[in-house]
Structure formats: C-alpha cells, structure tokens
Amino acid sequence: KEGGDLVELVKRMYNKHSVSDALAYLASKNITTVDKAIETAIAAKEYTTTKMNDVKLLPLSNHSLLSYFSSRRIDITIGRMYCREIHYKVEQKHYYGIAFGNLSEGHEVRNPYFKGCIGHKDITLLAHTFNEWQSGCLVFEGFMDFLAYMTLVKQQDRWFVVESPCDYMILNSVANIKRALQYLDRYTHIHCFLDNDQAGRKTVESISNVFEYRVTDESFRYADYKDVNDYLMRKR
C-alpha cells in the first residue's frame, strides 16, 4: 500500500501524468517513502502551504494519534498539554497528525507514517513558568524528546531530570542551530539533551564553542540509548 500511495502522491505533487514518470522521478531523487517524498518537496519549496487546504487545529483527541504517543511511552496528558491535532488536505486528500507549534507559527507534524513541517520551520521556546524566564535552558532536538523528558519528570526519574527549574528549547531540526544561538545567549546554564549521533554531537559542539562553560552535555544520562525518547521507551 505504501508503494501505491507514494506513486499517487508524487503524481499529484509533481504533475506526473503516468506511473512510469512518477517512478522515474522517485528514482532520480532516491525517494523510497511517502515521508521522504514530502520532505524532499518541502526542501525544494515545491510543496507549500498554498497546496494545503482546510488546515484546522483542534484539541488532541484522535485515537490513533493518542495510541502513537502510547507506543512511544509519552504520557498522554503531557502530549495533550503541549500538542494539538492538525487536519489538512492536499489535492483533496485528507491528512491529519500531531502538531507542535514553533516561534514562527509553523507546526511540526507527526503521525505513525509522516514526519514533517507545515508553515515555516523554526525553533520552539517554552518558559518553565508563564511570563518568567529562568537562568537555565534545556535544549532538545525534536519535540518527542521534549515530551519524553516531561514524562520522565512526571515519573520522578531522579537520574535523568535536571533539578533546577529551566526553560525548554526544541530545535525541531539541527539546521536551526543559528536561530537557536540567538535565543540561548540570555541563559547562564544550557543543558543539551541532543541525539547520540554525529549530528547531535556536532550541535553540542557548536553550542559549546559559543557559550563555553555555560554548556553541559547531558547525553551521559542516556549514553546507551539513541536519544531521550529511546531512553524512556527502553529503560528498566
């Protein structure tokens, strides 16, 4: 089904009139999933919000989306607190997902089959206390890691949680690092909870090069795991 959906999606998005034309395009761009097709189009600025109609943001209630949180061991109450449910149409086909807002009023969108962004890509910055910025900030790569961290706070995982109150920054992509640096300058303590991969380590290095002693790499807390959400899912 994924293969058929992918070909149909490419035909609609790129005005390919035949299956063979769509397949040739997929091969030329090394696209193998619906997710990759949409991400490639967004990157090329060919798949814009003008092609999305009837965009609606609602309280999160869809059973399959809540089940997705459960499959990632995210506390559903926390998920509902920080996320909304988004519905939209592309070429009259209905899509929906979990929406997480950013500073440019765009939204990161997730469902079990799709990972992307609607609107402008940007960081998300959340105050620990309403209208009151803290001296410390926790930095996450994606919002699922942030939600996983908040779930660990609720579980009172003392090994994992930073004791002092901090604000929260979600990069939503390591490509947003320059934007992030502008906002991190206000903080005296910066705690990096980034992915245990090359991109994550490079991002910590970039932040440390600018803010030096203010930065703590917190990845030792989940050294045997890919990221914060992986720790939550697999910890004993």
Q: What does each of the following model-derived ranges do?
A:
Residues 10, 69, 141, 149, ...:
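Terminal peptide-recognition signature
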Residues 88-183:
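Phosphate-handling DNA/RNA-contact segment within nucleic-acid enzymes
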Residues 8, 147, 205:
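Alpha-helical elements of the RecA-like P-loop NTPase motor core of helicases
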Residues 75-93:
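Short, basic/aromatic recognition patches
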Residues 4, 135, 151-236:
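TOPRIM fold recognition
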Residues 1-68:
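Non-catalytic accessory segments of DNA primases and related replication-initiation nucleases
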